[in-house]
Amino acid sequence: DEINRATPKTQSALLEAMQEHTVTVGNDSHKLEEPFFVLATQNPIENEGTYPLPEAQLDRFMFKILVEFPSKEELKGIVMLTEGANAPVIEKKMDGEGLLAARALVNQIPIADAVMDYLLDIVMETHVDNTYIKEGASPRAAQALIRGAKAKAFLDGRFNVSSKSYLF
């Protein structure tokens, strides 16, 4: 929670975990069990007591989702769901093995050359001279875009990547 409040030393340790799937304590390295992935929040409002996230760390996140403040009706729904006797009980829907199996299925979803080229063109366009883009998308970003399109196809019950897979 609020990853930008982590000290640079903690961020460095998290970067090691994200890149190498290991953590080091003293001189001992420990392999992290699969599936391992990081979900993080960032407080976009308050900057006091925060540390900037290094580009190398930001590049390892597949997506950044900006969550807007909910409407009054949405806020009411949130409050009604989370406060009082009707608060939902969180149920386990899948274990680690199931998640790894789903990941393997997603990886097998084919992507046509034309679709691949279109998605790579999007990434390449971030590298043209543009005053609005500070740094272009990395090769990891291209991989994440392809992986995200495959995952969307999988979640939609489709067995190939189409324009419906990347028009989020």
PLM region descriptions:
Residues 1-2, 13:
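Walker B catalytic acidic pair
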Residues 82-168:
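Basic, amphipathic alpha-helical bundle interface domains used for macromolecular binding and assembly
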Residues 2-6, 21:
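Conserved Walker B
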Residues 10, 18-109, 150-153:
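Canonical AAA+ ATPase core
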Residues 3, 29-30, 165:
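Proline- and acidic/polar-enriched loop/turn elements at helix boundaries
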